[in-house]
């Protein structure tokens, strides 16, 4: 047999260039790229070294023969022409893998059968002994690739794919193969950074694949050092002495590398279910001194190496089915960019994504991009130097083509009533604007039917205006009511200096049946606002309510102040804005319950927007039924029920006046010792049942829960503080 072989290394598509460099460095000669492969010449020692040291290859194939074929019979004869007695005992086991088609072979299973038949027929003894088939752990794994009439017949020296290092026995929902992770690290410059003593952090590490591959590189550990069974283990051409020498050298290098002071390599994962599997993987890889994995939210990611060294932040954010809808992903990418800008100045960053358009939302400019394939999914690796000159932040607002210039420059003359309304808006803006700026309030009620003939609520949401028209009583002439509304709408842009396109108008009236949940429109326009250090989503167009009850702002801020270390329960949670405040305040856990899937999806996006994960429970269900079955204990409870609620998903109708005693008794049964329950509602005729005051310590705090923008309308809601007697 020849001492020199043709070797083919297979790899994921997109890794060919990197694999070519690696293979040459490991001794492959005459190496050249092919699609998803590298081909070259090597002696057996180099082939073994490629098996042991390649971080990028899937398989190491030793080519036995190349031959032309036009039909199945020529395939059979070409395979049978190889002297298989040099490779396998007649009593040995065999597996055949066949790829490609053509020349009369249009079915890979049929092609594999012809290859198997040829080998078996060549090795069958006079006594009838012949190789058996073992698809799992054969003595010899044979590979035949058919490409445009040429058959390439090879032995698979690797056995199982080389990406299976043996440490990742537990994985998350969207695993990244080890050799692809290694390729991403190499492209990101990790070998250079590691050689300089740099750090590495992954804010969404899953079960730690990036971390482990990075540590293996930094510690000079052969990626397949711990593999016990190889494709060549029972091959008759195997030379154990050569393999033992190479394996011993690799063990010595690993021992020396692991004996060095470990680099700072840390991973953070929000999902508590992945922490122990990740740590188990690290332990199996023998890297417990090098790699540490902690539970941590993206929103609090801040790498702090022990010697203040900089390094590489690497991440494979979710980009498809594993983490919900595109909106949540958008906020996750925005949050990642925010954490990089705020906590990682001077670092390098590498973001591997199957959704490059989301990568553009991070507010950071990438200096280099590489194309990869993760299976069948085209991906990009974005390389970023986290320096201020690479930041893409701040609002850049220009007039759109369909927005007339006149909207900003020309003002129509107002009617007398319209001018009075405008004057009132400007007066309120002057008074409330000072308060809002001082308190950092972005969204507040500017006007609330201050002038009875203009029965509107006008709310400011940053540079948008949300207008709710209260339905006029039947005694008012509809034409006059319509005229006043038009006067007011004409006055609002002029008085407040906003474009008409940024005024959203709705009619508010008593909601009946399921109408309370129905969409008013379907524009799907969400905007982000800030309140008390958290970010919240509002929708000014699609629903009657915007997703943020402005009158409850003081209660939400109170909850944030009181939430540290507490178990928080939010009933009738709506879009869970109070839950976001509780999470921001350091709540140990949060549970939010609502009947509406729409609002719970909104709640999930609010949490995602702030970097909070699914550890914050969102429960869809009828609150009364849920409370009756729940056995949890909570330190802080917030209940803000609707006046009434009616849905196909619940039994009967909820009426706050009729049902509040049962509701509060159920909730107080879940309150831990020393806990506090806040109860509020907007029913203006509501009367708290006196029996509750007898059973519990009850304090009305309505006046304390009104900010200046609602002080002129003290009946907007009532609120109580409940504790156990």
From Swiss-Prot:
A single cellular component GO annotation: cytoplasm
InterPro entries xrefs: 23SrRNA_methyltr_KL (IPR017244), DNA_methylase_N6_adenine_CS (IPR002052), RlmKL-like_Mtase (IPR000241), RlmL_1st (IPR054170), SAM-dep_methyl-trfase (IPR019614), SAM-dependent_MTases_sf (IPR029063), THUMP_dom (IPR004114)
Xref: Gene3D superfamilies: 3.30.2130.30, RNA methyltransferase domain (HRMD) like (3.30.750.80), Vaccinia Virus protein VP39 (3.40.50.150)
Domain (THUMP): residue spans on this chain: 46-157
Primary enzyme class: transferase
EC number from the UniProt entry: 2.1.1.173, 2.1.1.264
CDD domains xrefs: AdoMet_MTases (cd02440), THUMP_AdoMetMT (cd11715)
Keyword annotations: Cytoplasm, Methyltransferase, RNA-binding, rRNA processing, S-adenosyl-L-methionine, Transferase
Catalytic activity: guanosine(2445) in 23S rRNA + S-adenosyl-L-methionine = N(2)-methylguanosine(2445) in 23S rRNA + S-adenosyl-L-homocysteine + H(+); guanosine(2069) in 23S rRNA + S-adenosyl-L-methionine = N(2)-methylguanosine(2069) in 23S rRNA + S-adenosyl-L-homocysteine + H(+)
One MF term in the entry's GO annotations: 23S rRNA (guanine(2445)-N(2))-methyltransferase activity
Main location per the UniProt record: cytoplasm
Localization in the cell: Cytoplasm
A UniProt-annotated Pfam family: UPF0020
Domain of life of the source: Bacteria
Described function: Specifically methylates the guanine in position 2445 (m2G2445) and the guanine in position 2069 (m7G2069) of 23S rRNA.
Similarity-based family: Belongs to the methyltransferase superfamily. RlmKL family.
Protein name: Ribosomal RNA large subunit methyltransferase K/L
Gene from which the chain derives: rlmL
């Amino acid at each position: 047999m020849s001492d020199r072989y043709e070797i083919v290394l297979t790899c994921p598509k997109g890794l060919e260039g990197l694999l070519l460099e690696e293979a040459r460095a490991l001794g492959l000669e005459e190496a050249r790229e092919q699609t998803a492969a590298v081909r070259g010449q090597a002696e057996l020692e180099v082939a073994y070294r490629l098996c042991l040291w390649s971080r990028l290859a899937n398989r190491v194939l030793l080519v036995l023969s190349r031959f032309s074929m036009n039909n199945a019979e020529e395939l059979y004869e070409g395979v049978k022409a190889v002297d298989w007695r040099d490779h396998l005992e007649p009593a040995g086991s065999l597996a055949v893998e066949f790829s490609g088609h053509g020349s009369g072979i249009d079915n890979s299973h049929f092609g594999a059968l012809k290859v198997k038949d040829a080998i078996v027929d060549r090795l069958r003894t006079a006594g009838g002994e012949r190789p058996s088939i073992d698809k799992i752990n054969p003595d010899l794994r044979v590979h035949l690739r058919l490409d445009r009439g040429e058959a390439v017949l090879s032995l698979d020296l690797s056995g199982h794919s080389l990406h299976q290092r043996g440490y990742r026995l537990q994985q998350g929902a969207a695993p990244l193969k080890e050799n692809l992770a290694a390729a991403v690290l190499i492209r990101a410059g990790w070998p250079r950074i590691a050689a300089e003593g740099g750090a590495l952090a992954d804010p969404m590490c899953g079960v730690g694949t990036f971390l482990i591959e990075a540590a293996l590189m930094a510690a000079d550990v052969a990626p397949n050092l711990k593999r016990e069974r190889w494709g060549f283990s029972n091959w008759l051409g195997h030379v154990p002495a050569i393999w033992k020498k190479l394996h011993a050298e690799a063990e010595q290098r690993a021992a020396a590398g692991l004996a060095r002071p470990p680099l700072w390599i840390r991973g953070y994962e929000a999902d508590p279910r992945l922490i122990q599997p990740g740590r188990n993987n690290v332990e199996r890889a023998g890297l417990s001194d090098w790699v540490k994995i902690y539970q941590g939210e993206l929103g609090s990611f801040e790498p702090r190496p022990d010697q203040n060294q900089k390094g590489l932040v690497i991440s494979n954010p979710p980009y498809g089915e594993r983490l919900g809808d595109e909106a949540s992903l958008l906020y996750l990418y925005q949050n990642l960019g925010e954490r990089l800008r705020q906590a990682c100045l001077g670092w390098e960053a590498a973001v591997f994504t199957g959704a490059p358009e989301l990568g553009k939302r991070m507010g950071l400019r990438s200096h280099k991009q590489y194309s990869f394939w993760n299976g069948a999914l085209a991906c990009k690796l974005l390389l970023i130097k986290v320096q201020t000159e690479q930041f893409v932040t701040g609002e850049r607002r220009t007039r759109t083509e369909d927005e007339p210039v006149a909207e900003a420059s020309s003002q129509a003359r107002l009617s007398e009533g319209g001018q009075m309304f405008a004057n009132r808006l400007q007066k309120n803006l002057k008074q409330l604007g000072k308060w809002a700026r001082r308190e950092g309030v972005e969204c507040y009620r500017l006007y609330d039917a201050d002038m009875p003939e203009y029965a509107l609520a006008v709310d400011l949401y940053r540079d948008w205006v949300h207008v709710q028209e209260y339905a006029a009583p039947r005694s008012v002439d509809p034409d006059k009511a319509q005229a006043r509304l038009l006067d007011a709408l004409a006055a609002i842009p002029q008085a407040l200096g906003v474009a008409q396109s940024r005024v959203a108008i709705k009619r508010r009236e008593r909601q009946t049946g399921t109408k309370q949940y129905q969409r008013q429109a379907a524009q799907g326009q969400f905007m982000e606002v800030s309140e008390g250090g958290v970010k919240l989503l509002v929708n000014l167009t699609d629903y009657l309510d915007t997703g943020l009850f402005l009158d409850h702002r003081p209660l939400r801020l109170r909850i944030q102040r009181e939430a540290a270390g507490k178990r928080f329960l939010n009933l009738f949670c709506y879009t869970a804005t109070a839950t976001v405040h509780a999470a921001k305040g350091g709540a140990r856990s949060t549970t939010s319950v609502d009947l509406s899937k729409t609002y719970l999806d909104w709640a999930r996006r609010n949490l995602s927007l702030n970097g909070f994960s699914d550890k914050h429970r969102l429960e869809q269900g009828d609150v009364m039924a849920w409370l009756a079955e729940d056995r949890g204990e909570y330190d802080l409870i917030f209940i803000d029920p609707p006046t009434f609620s009616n849905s196909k998903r619940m039994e009967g109708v909820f009426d706050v006046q009729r049902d509040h005693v049962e509701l509060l008794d159920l909730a107080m049964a879940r309150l831990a010792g020393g806990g506090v329950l806040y109860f509020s509602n907007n029913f203006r005729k509501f009367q708290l049942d006196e029996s509750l005051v007898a059973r519990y310590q009850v304090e009305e705090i309505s006046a304390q829960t009104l900010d200046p923008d609602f002080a002129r309308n003290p009946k907007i809601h009532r609120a109580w503080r409940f504790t156990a007697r």
